[in-house]
Amino acid sequence: MGLRFVLGRSGSGKSTYILDEIKKEAQKNETTSIILLVPEQYTFEAENRVSKLFLGKEKDKYLRVRVLSFKTLSNIVFSQVGGLTDVNINSSGKAMMVYRAIEDVSEELNVFSKSKSQSGFVSSITDMISEMKQYNISPEMLENISGELDNETLSLKLKDISKIYNSFEGKLHENYVDAQDMLTSLTSKIELSSYLDGACVYIDEFTGFTPNQYNVIKSILNKSKSVNISLTVDDINYIGYSKSDMFSRTKFTYSKLTQLCNEEGIKILPQVNLNTGVIKRFEKVKELQHLERFYNAYPYKIYSNPTENIKIKEFNNLYSEVEEIAREIVHLVRDKNVRYRDITIATRDLNRYDFLVHSIFNEYNIPNFIDKKREAKSNPIVILIISALEMKNRRYGYETMFRYLKSGLIGIDNDDINLLENYVLANGIKGKKWFDEKWDYRITQSLSGQESEFELELKEKINEIKNRVLEPIVILQEKLRGKNRVKEICRYIYEFLLDINMPETIESLIVNFKDKGELDVANQYSQVWDIVVDILDQMVELMGDEIISLEKFIKLITLGFDEYELGLVPPSIDQVLVSSVDRMKNPDTKYLYLVGTTDGVFPLITKDSGILSDNDRESLGNKGIEVDIDSKTRSFEEQFLVYKALTSTSKNLTITYPISDHEGKTLRPSIIISRLKKIFPNIENKSYLVEENKNTDKDILKKITVKSPTFNELINVIKNYDSDGYNTEEINSIWLDIYRYYLKDEIYSSITKKVIKGLSYTNQVHKIEEKKIRSLYKSNSLSISRLEKYAECPFAYFIQYGLKAKKRKEYSFTPPDLGTFIHNILDRFSKELLQDNLTWRDIDEKYIELKIGIIVDEIILKIPGYILNSSERYKYLAYRLKNMLTTAITIISQQIKQGSFEPIDYEVKFGDNGKYPPIKMVLENGQEVSLIGQIDRVDEFEEGENKYIRIIDYKSGNKSISLTEIYYGLQLQLLVYLDAILESAKDEDMNINPAAILYCRINNPIAKFNEDKDDEEIQEAILKELRMKGLVVKDSHIVKEMDKSLIDGERKNSLVIPVGLTKDGNVGKSTSAISYEDFKLLRKYVRHAIKDLCEEMLSGEIRIAPYKHKDGTSCDFCDYSAICQFDSTIKDNKYKNLNNKSNEEIIKMMKGDVN
């Protein structure tokens, strides 16, 4: 019986020495156990190393040797003397039990009364309880010490922890034990077990132990033949230490174990000192020897020789950092016969690098294993279960429903799910609407008209998908009504999973993943299903008969899933290990890449956080209560981790860092970098911030790795080459050989040809054949609004009307919806006026208010699921729209009463089935097109043999007419409408003349006042705010017939139209008025512009040509900008600039174009 320390610096051969000792001991003809005790995460690697000791004829000797952790040692001892029947609660069950404990004492809490409901609190308390148990601190001890403290906050905090801890212990020990209890029990049961009698025990890879583990070691020392413990320390003649000492943790462990042996009367055998001579791991590499010896030495010694085996590399970002490492690994394996297993990638922040490394290494065909446990809660199986349970509490909202539907595990085709999703989003389906017997919402969201056969069939299909989706959900939700026992809810969940064929689906997925070689993913799905079953079983065991609300059950099962992690076994022996520096366990590493070595990350800046602060821990320490170390001590221990990382390779060390993160934020190099530069002034410090385009054979060969990345490099070389031609003299012959290789490759041949062709690609598109464009646009009938869209940008028009691409409709009341609604109401109102034998001059605000209320209510109630009837919010919006329309129509009535013009028609269509025939136009190639459209309102005034026409278009926005926009084809509608009316009436006996083309604004007027105004002045301000905008004929007589208040000189500026009169009664120059001749010119120019646009469109022109003017561009609100990728900095991406000229200049330009 005795303890022997195996001491040495990192790399001195402590583990190798222990393995040699194990082999020697195994050679003896004895039957007692040989035990290698290591931390849980090291068991796999340790078993692998031990198995290699006994090959061939010696393999029988292996039977005496066991690699154990404290947990597996417990299982062996308990199997001998009892204890295995105690139900061991895992971290998942423990978290659920802690939650219940908090709930039970929630009314008694002081400091944590508000924190108890916060995210992460249960996890923090669970960790706190574990820490207390590890350090043998009972709830009673916490309660007692709280009364001795002067710090009131800490005292109350300890009382709260004690109450929760005590409640947890009471629940736990009814039927269970946890990991800490097992260690406590192990201490006593080792004495009863014969397993350790005469055993040789070797303890390796630990830096320290918890009090419970010290007690277990004490029991082991008293039972076994010998105990050997390895510790990483520097000066074995001086084991005294301070907290700032890099080896403080291991020196503390040495001191603690020595004290334990002295107290127990256990002999301490002579130490094994491995610090003599050259450190074994670095005996062939002097730089690494020097690094190990002097990195933390003060003063340090400079290594003045050339430094070849330690390198520093700087990169722009994480991606370029990892990709360069991948290239190096390919060359190491291919050119230097290095094995993948000899290479380790280590980082202090594995979460930042794991996905990136895995993706890039797979691209480079580098086998790799990410030594990181995956969270079970992110697996689709868990997401499906939680979503199914949350549906009711979250009112069957979109997020919850489609998290469930898109899990890929419910046996419904993705296309069907997407169809259902579009319909649900467009109609705002949530809550009870999901359970309507039949959904009858319109597919097209139209306010009028019959549904087509296509719409009806599609609606039937959607309802069929909905019913399939809901069938198992309805069954589950019926069972979950009210409060249930936990065991009943668990049974309902399992039955639900059977209803959707979950076991068969998972089994099928696992087979598919294995067939594709994705063993990692297959293993994850297999584990998660076992986890689901385990959690349900554990909940039944823990609280099966407890009656619980669904909300509380969801919190508990979510806590359970949060605690589970998926452990993965390396699928191959020869692979690159990717690990966090604190879990690094590849003893055969020859090439170490320490990545992401940035300030604050490595060494990690530890924060004072958690339930107990650093000051709290210090106060407890002063009272003789030992707890875990504080953040300051952790910061000092981080230096030990840096030391361990830097000394984990036997041949080559490369330290890399990026200067910016994923978001482009600046990163600074770690203090490790500056320290290395001081010790090794000749160290290679290579920067990859600016890519070197060296064309030497050596540099090119470095870029040639495996097929996919090399292909990308080849494409970049060609892409960066002279765009005017392919000059073989300037491209290195190696690249030409590579190019020829890919042209012959079975897989890459066609890809190479396509990519080379694509290098000349721009986002500019070419003309489409006329035959194809006609088949896309089909009819020769064109609406004016579509022509305006084409004038804005031919490509956007092609996407919208040629390819018929649509933005996904979501359940909201958008400006276009408002415009459609307003037009529909105004059309209905105007027609009902005629049915009531009334004119605009006969009605007052009371009539308007009543009629609008009836019309709006009819529309809202007529359409199933109409948004304005969907909620109190939207019902209030409908109420406001009634008021707005009442006000706007009252203004329209006043505008009409103010003049002599009478509305003669509404929603006037010109087209094949319209009141007026379409406008026919013959193009240069002889093709005839028909222009169709719809006029909101036509007003008329007759005087003698003259008739004057006024075209009105209703707009919810504040729009006016611009001659510049007419010139460029962006505002054609009103002039085309005017032209259509004038042309259709030219055969009448009267002279038909244009009077105006105007936009009538339908909106709530917002008038600003600087002082109090009376009612008449307020009314005048409202009329002015809603005054129509557009172009009026420059004829003072006709102007006065549109606003009679101008006749007697009562006012100079009209409140109806955008015109003012001068003192002598003429139309003012600064108003929106043009002559009859100019109106005639505009009509002629518009025909000319339309003809040009039609010819261009039907010729197949779909170029990306958005316009730009002082107010913005046509790209500003375009739904298709992500498709065209227009960028004015790219060649050939130019805006069509609309030159802002005066009306006189525009008129002159128009004359030049039409003559």
From Swiss-Prot:
HAMAP family for the chain: AddB_type1 (MF_01452)
Entry similarity comment: Belongs to the helicase family. AddB/RexB type 1 subfamily.
GO MF annotation terms: 4 iron, 4 sulfur cluster binding; 5'-3' exonuclease activity; ATP binding; double-stranded DNA binding; helicase activity; metal ion binding
The keyword Methyltransferase appears for this protein: no
Taxonomic classification: Bacteria, Bacillati, Bacillota, Clostridia, Peptostreptococcales
Note: Despite having conserved helicase domains, this subunit does not have helicase activity.
InterPro entries associated with the record: ADDB_N (IPR049035), DNA_helicase_suAddB (IPR014140), P-loop_NTPase (IPR027417), PDDEXK-like_dom_sf (IPR011604), PDDEXK_AddAB-type (IPR038726)
Pfam families documented for this protein: ADDB_N, PDDEXK_1
Binding-site residues, ATP: G8, R9, S10, G11, S12, G13, K14, S15
Origin superkingdom: Bacteria
Cysteines joined through disulfide linkages: none
Cofactor(s) required for function per UniProt: Mg(2+); [4Fe-4S] cluster
Binding site for [4Fe-4S] cluster: C793, C1115, C1118, C1124
EC number(s) on file: 3.1.-.-
Classification via Gene3D superfamilies: 3.90.320.10, P-loop containing nucleotide triphosphate hydrolases
Biological role stated in the UniProt entry: The heterodimer acts as both an ATP-dependent DNA helicase and an ATP-dependent, dual-direction single-stranded exonuclease. Recognizes the chi site generating a DNA molecule suitable for the initiation of homologous recombination. The AddB subunit has 5' -> 3' nuclease activity but not helicase activity.
Note on how the cofactor is bound: Binds 1 [4Fe-4S] cluster.
Protein name: ATP-dependent helicase/deoxyribonuclease subunit B
